[in-house]
Amino acid sequence: MWTPSRKQLCLAFLSVCVLSAGSFFFHLNGGNFFQNALTFSVLCPDYHLLKSPVAMVCLPYPSNASSGSPSCPEQSLLSGTWTITPGGRFGNQMGQYATLLALAQLNGRRAFIQPEMHTTLAPVFRISLPVLDPEVDSLTPWQHLVLHDWMSEEYSHLEDPFLKLSGFPCSWTFFHHLREQIRREFTLHDHLREDAQRLLSGLRIGPAGIRPRTYVGVHVRRGDYLEVMPNRWKGVVGDRAYLQKAMDWFRARHKDPIFVVTSNGMRWCLENIDTSHGDVVFAGNGQEGTPGKDFALLTQCNHTIMTIGTFGFWAAYLAGGDTVYLANFTLPDSEFLKIFRPKAAFLPEWVGINADLSPLQAQFDPWETDSLFRLA
């Protein structure tokens, strides 16, 4: 009777181990082992000497309530890796996050955010997208795509497995079909929500101390827009007359409303917003570096008045209810209209109140600015 030698037994055992390991990696990688080197790259650090690595390694963030993001992504059937270059401030990066999530899902890709975006958004929201390791980012063979600020058919058929998006997308046309998921991603941390609700619950209207029935968040965008809008884009920001009309719109439709004003130009608000009704409170701190408090206040209101900017858009989008926005805030020949489409920026059910462009029209009227031509 034949009896295998010790050497033959060892070789047989080794073969079984190799086959088992190969089967494990094959199934773990969704049957796409050779096209996607994720598992092999993680297990073999020197693999990048042979092939550009595509492993996505999470940063070692602690998984606690303040971080918002899980320390590593769950296994999924999605392939490839997409990310987006963070840019701008809080509202801009919210738009970039939501657009990345929506486009990656639409094209069957995995989405990862940059550490800078995590630093901006995670202190405020319970975001779930994992973070891309900087070293992996630097070694990945990215394709690049600059997005414009509205959804296009071409964005539904993007075939690049390793794609780095850029631009400042913040249009509901990218992600509105995922509204409930977006709202979950932008869920406030408990302490921010509770602080906002505590402040709102203590507000009263007028000397009689009437308890408000409706809370209207008001975001007045000023700051750098005071220079950028007229000088670069031939546009205006929300003025006193616009805010008065917007508040009157709500007063005509809701009993006992209270207006909760936040702004990065609170001094102007104090001097220009009519408080004679006793229904206006200046509640925000206007700190652009720590926007969580102001944003939480706005989203916990029932309705929104916004002027311009992505911060106000997101406050209105997450608060729900009625939204009044500043419409037609640039001259018709503004370069801004080449990168901004109002129908893609404001939801159809939102209510627009036209801006007063007369100061701009006088500024750019050749009869007013060219005295020689006027005399001729």
From Swiss-Prot:
Catalytic activities: a beta-D-galactosyl-(1->4)-N-acetyl-beta-D-glucosaminyl derivative + GDP-beta-L-fucose = an alpha-L-Fuc-(1->2)-beta-D-Gal-(1->4)-beta-D-GlcNAc derivative + GDP + H(+); a ganglioside GA1 + GDP-beta-L-fucose = a ganglioside Fuc-GA1 + GDP + H(+); a beta-D-Gal-(1->3)-beta-D-GlcNAc-(1->3)-beta-D-Gal-(1->4)-beta-D-Glc-(1<->1')-Cer(d18:1(4E)) + GDP-beta-L-fucose = alpha-L-fucosyl-(1->2)- beta-D-galactosyl-(1->3)-N-acetyl-beta-D-glucosaminyl-(1->3)-beta-D-galactosyl-(1->4)-beta-D-glucosyl-(1<->1')-N-acylsphing-4-enine + GDP + H(+); a neolactoside nLc4Cer(d18:1(4E)) + GDP-beta-L-fucose = a neolactoside IV(2)-alpha-Fuc-nLc4Cer(d18:1(4E)) + GDP + H(+)
Pathway noted in the entry: Protein modification; protein glycosylation
Species, as recorded: Rattus norvegicus
Membrane topology type: Single-pass type II membrane protein
Residues listed as glycosylation sites in the UniProt record: N64, N302, N328
Record's keyword terms, sorted: Glycoprotein, Glycosyltransferase, Golgi apparatus, Lipid metabolism, Membrane, Signal-anchor, Transferase, Transmembrane, Transmembrane helix
UniProt miscellaneous comment: There are two genes (Fut1 and Fut2) which encode galactoside 2-L-fucosyltransferase. They are expressed in a tissue-specific manner with expression restricted to cells of mesodermal or endodermal origin respectively.
Protein EC: 2.4.1.69, 2.4.1.344
Listed transmembrane segments: 13-29
PANTHER family: GALACTOSIDE 2-L-FUCOSYLTRANSFERASE, GALACTOSIDE ALPHA-(1,2)-FUCOSYLTRANSFERASE 1
GO molecular function: alpha-(1,2)-fucosyltransferase activity; fucosyltransferase activity; galactoside 2-alpha-L-fucosyltransferase activity
Residues in compartment: Lumenal: 30-376
Predominant location category: Golgi
Entry-linked CDD domains: Fut1_Fut2_like
Cytoplasmic side: 1-12
Subcellular location per the Swiss-Prot or TrEMBL entry: Golgi apparatus, Golgi stack membrane
Function: Catalyzes the transfer of L-fucose, from a guanosine diphosphate-beta-L-fucose, to the terminal galactose residue of glycoconjugates through an alpha(1,2) linkage leading to H antigen synthesis that is an intermediate substrate in the synthesis of ABO blood group antigens. H antigen is essential for maturation of the glomerular layer of the main olfactory bulb, in cell migration and early cell-cell contacts during tumor associated angiogenesis. Preferentially fucosylates soluble lactose and to a lesser extent fucosylates glycolipids gangliosides GA1 and GM1a.
GO cellular component: Golgi apparatus; Golgi cisterna membrane
GO biological process: fucosylation; lipid metabolic process; olfactory bulb development; oligosaccharide biosynthetic process; positive regulation of cell-matrix adhesion; positive regulation of endothelial cell migration; positive regulation of endothelial cell-matrix adhesion via fibronectin; positive regulation of sprouting angiogenesis
Family: Belongs to the glycosyltransferase 11 family.
Pfam families: Glyco_transf_11
Top enzyme category: transferase
Protein name as annotated: Galactoside alpha-(1,2)-fucosyltransferase 1
